[in-house]
């Protein structure tokens, strides 16, 4: 009664899974047992993260990347998750780059520092951004929300991460030009960044959401 569904799996399973799932669904449909001949609304095949040398990871070859070692080395789970989403399109094989996790770790640190600078401001500081700053913040935030939303819906996770990186860069440029204040526009920009980043980096965003004064979860 819950068919059809979305289907996600590795390309190496495609032939067998499609053969048997579609065969049985069409067989049941002809018997009048199910309402549709197709079991899937949408099919997506995920690619592989290869070893740094471009070969498939294998224990026998000794080229497997251990995620626990990366997390325990000080980078944490979120930097690893973000890099896995950023490394390549969902359906394209890509070699592991040892420089990748340090890069996403720096990105998350920059986002963290922006939020910390905002929450550490004196509450008596200016509550109003000047008109130019307000427009820049709103334009950057809304355009990023639109791009990230579209990319997530299309499973383009790597470009979603790239858009969030561009947003952080843009926020730093605005900060360097006009500073950070306690305005609604800065709050909106930072809270929006936290919310769109949450599916990719759930741990740091939960902490940042609390830092922004929320008692509920960001998820």
Q: What name fits each language-model region?
A:
Residues 1-92:
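Alpha-helical recognition segments enriched in aromatics with Gly/Pro capping
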Residues 36, 69-219:
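Helix-rich, typically C-terminal accessory recognition domains appended to large enzymatic cores
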